[in-house]
Amino acid sequence: MSLSADVMAATKFSEEQLAKYVIDATKEVFSTMVMMDPADEYPLQEAVNRFKCSITGMVGFAGIYSGVISIHCPVNLAMKITSNMLGLECDEVNEDLNDAIGEISNMLGGSVKQVLSKGGLDVKLSIPTVIAGEDYTVNSLSDSDCVVIPFKIDDDKFLVGLVLKKED
């Protein structure tokens, strides 16, 4: 999975530069809001689109760019993230967990929006969408314009993905 030449030309960023922005945004959100320090393991060695016992938070982009930023993590890690973020114990998939993962995806979307758009005025964000399940697949219709960054916190791994398209 990588970004096409068209997307890189439109954004004026290389894939590595966009990946660095996503990595920096993820580390910033996690250090300030979750009090966790994720280590990136970029680049992703093998494409992942099937998730088991996981939760996915997504925010869409619309405007001069369209696309999605997403975070995919195992439920056990999502419960730790939620507990740290909200300062309360979370031991099941519930509204608090969905809200926390949705808010993290929203903050990541806001960070990327600022990079892609001068002042963020020509790119809008959707409301976060959260999916959780025992076994599900997430597919993009534009895998050729996708950057996925693996992260690790202790022994837990999660992914942050950015799918991007320049609108005409």
In which residue ranges do the predicted regions lie?
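N-terminal auxiliary interaction/assembly segments of multi-subunit proteins
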Residues: 1-168
